[in-house]
Amino acid sequence: MRQVERHWIKEGHYLYPICDDLTFKAKNLYNAGLYQIRQSIFERNKCQEEEKPSVLSWTELVSQFRKEKQGDMLALPSKVSTNILKILGFSINSYYQLLKGFHDKSNPSVTNKPRFPRYLHKTEGRYVVEFTNQTFSKKRGSNGELILCPKDLKLPIPTKVEDPQCVRIVPKLNAFVIEVIYNVEVSLLKHTGTYAAIDLGVDNLASSTFSDGVNPLLVKGTKIKSINQGYNRLIAKAKSKLPANQKTSQGIHRLWRNRELKLQSELHKVTSFLSLYFDEMSIEKVFIGKNQGWKQEVTLGKKINQTFTQIPFTTFISQLIYKCLARGIEVVEQEESYTSKASFVDQDEIPTYGKGNEKFAFSGKRVSRGMYRTKNGFLLNADVNGSYNILVKGLLALGKSLDREKASFHTRSLKNWQFVANKDLLLQYM
């Protein structure tokens, strides 16, 4: 399994001008390569013969540029420039794959028509630079730095990773992110027969239920909401002061960057806690609810929609997946349509959206903020009801069933965000 160590390089850092220069040269090579590929596509479309010429591949592009001694390619180390054109080639292939999926009406995975890769801005554009382990020096720097391209650049990268596989310089919001990618060993998957499910939301960021009767655990999302709302106000205020013909500024980029870093920090705390918690509970598999296009089609009201779409749930899921996998726990993304509407207590059938049953009738309903009422008038937490239904769906996909008699509805809430994922604190929630 691969993990990433990230270093944010802001203006004023000694590596900033080097990163800026490399990504600028990478942009020039990207634009030059894209131009050649576009020309080959135009020639193919103009051709009237039955056997049309093929679109220029990235390998052919590398050979052509080397033969011509193309200036943008010579401006970068050979292996680095090759990787840039390779990434461009993969982007072109991805475009055609997505376009094929968009025109395939039987495949609903691609809902919006993809756009062909575009040229980057001549002066402001920057592009990703990737260094494989073939460009690393065998010797480290005086302070343990990883040395990239020792013959050409001699670029020192501060890292604690002993055996990195790849290094990327990614331009992001007027800054650069140096990503050091490395491999980690994965623990053997558990086979305990105990399962958990997570329902993601706004007020309750993660509502966890369990198959063995353990009380549900609610991780509150109040701090995430507070961060979003605070930065939304600051960004709106900054935008109101911009000239009419200006869309953004360095100050706004700085606000977006700080917002992302704070959200990343909070999500890391939560996912670290949950992965340790599931490990201590001997959970074999975790089902986490997610629907295709859920952020594009959400209809929860204007204010809640804004908060829901701004919370990086995909980041949360990816963090939880690799942290649980490191502990031998598998995380499965489970389709969750109708799980919030169906009554878990009344054992309602939970259909799948888009199979002709959109008008399905359910025994209970949501009656107030955060509460669900069953057919017999029993009130329970609405997110707990949804989480249990996700658990039912997940187990059904495995050919198993949930013992509903063991289900507990007495929730425990995790409100303190200043926690560290350790076993001493964990005992308070078990």
Residue ranges, per PLM feature:
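Nucleic-acid substrate recognition interfaces
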Residues: 1-430
